[in-house]
Amino acid sequence: IQVATKLAPYPWRIGNRGFNKPFLKSLERLNNKLDIVQLHWSTAKYNPWQELGLLNNLCDLKDEGFDFEIGLSNIGPKRLMKLIKFLAKRDQHLKSVQIQFSLLAPDLGKQYQVKKICDENKIDFLAYSPLSFGILCIDPDKEENKEKSFIRNSLFENYKKPTYELRRCLKRIAHQRSVSQAQVAINWCCYQGTIPLVGMRKKSQVIDVSNVFNWNLKKNEFKVLQEISKKCFKKMPKNPFSSN
């Protein structure tokens, strides 16, 4: 098990010591078990020098003897290449990149560019929101129970109709393979060599997700999902902080 955290580059966290306090607080909360520290988002769009100082800060902490690896999140291919080179000058290898990646993710073309760079540089590609906030788990032929959250209810209602064909395909494959819709959607991520980060709140969800690794999508199943995904024009919202 690897423990990872994300440190946010808030405006007041600047310079080569901006992450010292939140890093030490995280380390304390996690009982000194912290394997990966990620920059939560790129500041390239509005304050590019800030993230360089904060990454220098993480490199300094490693030089001081703290044992962890550095990761990035919500970053585009151009900025990723620059930061890989930046870290290399500090003799540091980037461990991971965390990106929104699912059948409903926006800008999948850009995500695939990031994935290619990760593969070429032996960087782990972490796929967050692989179930698109649970939308891909909704049974296309049944009315789901109302969620406790008003925001989630509104989200589900807005996406039910536009994603119907995609969810129907997920259900068909799930039925043929005797698995859940969630497993199919997650397996789509695994098929492409990513590491999906799945949010789980219930024991039943943990058990279900653990079974993802007992089977693999077939090539024809993957292709069908790809085709239907492309036809689905209602994608998840873009992360406003994601860089180019």
Ranges and model annotations:
Residues 18, 22, 37, 187-188, ...:
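Generic alpha-helical secondary-structure signal
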Residues 29-46:
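Active-site groove signature of glycoside hydrolases
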Residues 15-30, 78-84:
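Short, acidic/polar
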